[in-house]
Amino acid sequence: MPDRPENFASVFIYSDELANFEYSPTHPFKPIRAKLTLDLCRRYDLIDRPWIRIVKPEPLPFEVMAEFHDVTYLRALQTVDSAGLAELRSNVPSTPERDLLTIDPQILKYELGTDDNPVFAGVYDYSALAAGATFLGAEMVASGEVQAAFNPVGGFHHAARDHAEGFCYVNDVAVAITHLLKEGLRVAFVDIDAHHCNGVQDAFYGDDRVLVISLHESGGQLYPWSGFENEIGEGKGRGYTVNVPLPEKTDDEAFVRAFEEVVPPLLKAFAPDLVIAELGADTHISDPLTHLNMTNFGYGQVVKKLAEQIPRLLALGGGGYDVYKTVRSWTLAWAILNHLEPRDEYVGIIGGMMFGPEVEAGDLHDKTVYATGVVKERINREIDRVLDYIKQTVFPIHKIPLTLPLSRQGRG
């Protein structure tokens, strides 16, 4: 682990109020991951350090969210933020017919009240608080007060200006970036969540002050069905959106290679004032909603490369639907951001703390999984094709010299 820079400071942004929200008992998105992550960080002695603080966020005011979001949509979100609607739905058995009858069509046009985006008491307050957490982290990093910030309940990258989408109600990323742009800053957003960041991409598709880089499972097989390599921005923003769609069963080795060939040179050329990184852990092989074969071994390598290159970084949790694997990955990421080696002081103690069946001998690191044979050949061939397109189409816009792709060296 590299030495921690002098005068380094970091914040873990956390609120019990955020962690205790629940979309529904059966919904795959679990805010409780934030509390479990903080608990595991404490177990690994990753919190009680002189340079680390836990800070509690405040809800973001309506008018700040309205700098990005459509006002009528935010008002609709406020409208469904009532126990009345939640109780109306809970008192009648769930059927498609009931859902259509009990949800106002004017609300449905905002994609509120769907299976993905259920309405529940406190949904507006929850969204405003999550956005406030990301906004706080962005301000602290931008001002230089801290060099690293982590908001585990952040990264709602699917929400659009005028509707909810993909478990996301308020696009905290777009709201924060919009504010940072008003302060004259250049921002890079690096997203390694398995799902493409369609909401953030759409928000800044024509803007050359924001560099959006997303490595994700291909939209040919996974929601939101977007994020192909030829989506590179438009107008002044041409070349400032970069997508690396990954084929199913992509392993650690292939993911890290794709990241190394694209992200560091683009960040160096763009020279942002700060970087926001979405560290979604749904790329994990055990995730129930995705089809990649990564472990937190490759995930940790990528986070480490970001931490080494970026002096000011805001990290957001994003997705991850195997709760325990996600919590382990986020804990590992927090350790890396703070230049710490996680060690479990309870290993070997009879009756000591336990954290699910995945904790093996107190080590947060997974054993990597390798694709082999024709599967590996297919993965490499597809990733080579995507990387070639980016290098030939996007790199020249940023005056990045073309070199032989690392993936081809020694392969012929």
Describe the role of every protein-language-model region.
Residues 1-408:
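HDAC/HDAC-like amidohydrolase catalytic core signature
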